[in-house]
C-alpha cells in the first residue's frame, strides 16, 4: 500500500476493538432479557402450586405472613391499669360539676402562666458587682448568724406547719422563689 493511505493502523485496531465490545455487550444484554422473561413466566404460575400440610409452617409470632390462619383470642381489656385522672362524673351530680368553677384561678394553674401583660411581670433586681474583699467580715458573720437562726427557727416549728411546708413543694414556682430568696445575701 502507499504511504498516503489516510488512517494509521492503530485507529483501525481501536475501531475493531470497540465494535467487538459492542457486539459482546449486545449479546449479554439480550441473554439477560430472555432469562428475565423466562423467570417471570415461572413466577406467574407458582400460585397454582398447593403445598402439602406438612410443608406449611405457621410461626408462633409471625411478623408479616401467616396471619389468616391464627384464631384470635378474646381480649380482656380490664387487664390494663387505669390511669390516675379525674373520675368521670354523671350529669345528675350538679354539686360536683359546680365545684371546679369555685376553685380560684391560681389553684388551677399548674406550671406556666399564659398572662403576658406587663402589669403582672416583675423584674429581678440586678446583682451588685462588689467584691467579697470589699465587704467587711462583720457582714459575713452576720449572714452566717442569720442562716443559723433561720435553721433553728425551722426546726422549732411544731408538726402542724408540716402541711404548709409540703404545700410549698407542690408549687415549683413558689419553691424556687424561696430558694432564690435564701441564696441572695441580706444587706
UniProtKB/Swiss-Prot annotation:
Domain of life: Eukaryota
Localization in the cell: Cell membrane
Keywords of this entry: Adaptive immunity, Cell membrane, Disulfide bond, Immunity, Membrane, Phosphoprotein, Signal-anchor, Transmembrane, Transmembrane helix
Side Cytoplasmic, residues: 29-187
Ranges annotated as spanning the membrane: 8-28
A cellular-component GO term for this protein: centriolar satellite
Keyword Glycoprotein tagged: no
Topology of this chain in the membrane: Single-pass type III membrane protein
Summary of the tissues where the protein is detected: Present in T-cells (at protein level).
InterPro entries: T-cell_rcpt-assoc_TM_adapter-1
Coiled-coil boundaries: none
Known partners and oligomeric status: Homodimer; disulfide-linked. Interacts with CD3Z. When phosphorylated, interacts with PIK3R1.
Protein name, entry field: T-cell receptor-associated transmembrane adapter 1
Lineage: Eukaryota, Metazoa, Chordata, Craniata, Vertebrata
